[in-house]
């Protein structure tokens, strides 16, 4: 279930301030954030935001198709390396 339209989209205040400051300064440097739950707004298009995945910051370039999604959707937190293979010639 989505968020109520009456409330509007959630975005961290500090992140929104950084994006708006870069828009006024015409600066496109990487913005680091831990706010995975922030919604991507049209103001963010063209920016690169480094989203924390629990270990490192993953750079995410914002495009038009990402509007309305959350930042955390583009920075996976789990790594899957496949199931362990059986050793060759192992007896069961």
UniProtKB/Swiss-Prot annotation:
Gene: rpsS
Domain of life per record: Bacteria
The protein's role, per its UniProt record: Protein S19 forms a complex with S13 that binds strongly to the 16S ribosomal RNA.
Keywords, alphabetical: Ribonucleoprotein, Ribosomal protein, RNA-binding, rRNA-binding
GO-annotated biological processes: ribosomal small subunit assembly; translation
GO MF entries: rRNA binding; structural constituent of ribosome
InterPro entries noted in UniProt: Ribosomal_uS19, Ribosomal_uS19_bac-type, Ribosomal_uS19_CS, Ribosomal_uS19_SF
UniProt-listed SUPFAM superfamilies: Ribosomal protein S19
Protein name, as recorded: Small ribosomal subunit protein uS19
This protein's record includes keyword Cell wall biogenesis/degradation: no
Pfam families for the chain: Ribosomal_S19
GO cellular component annotations of the record: cytoplasm; small ribosomal subunit
Family of the protein in this entry: Belongs to the universal ribosomal protein uS19 family.
PANTHER family, alphabetized: RIBOSOMAL PROTEIN S19P FAMILY MEMBER, SMALL RIBOSOMAL SUBUNIT PROTEIN US19M
Native source organism of the sequence: Prochlorococcus marinus (strain MIT 9215)
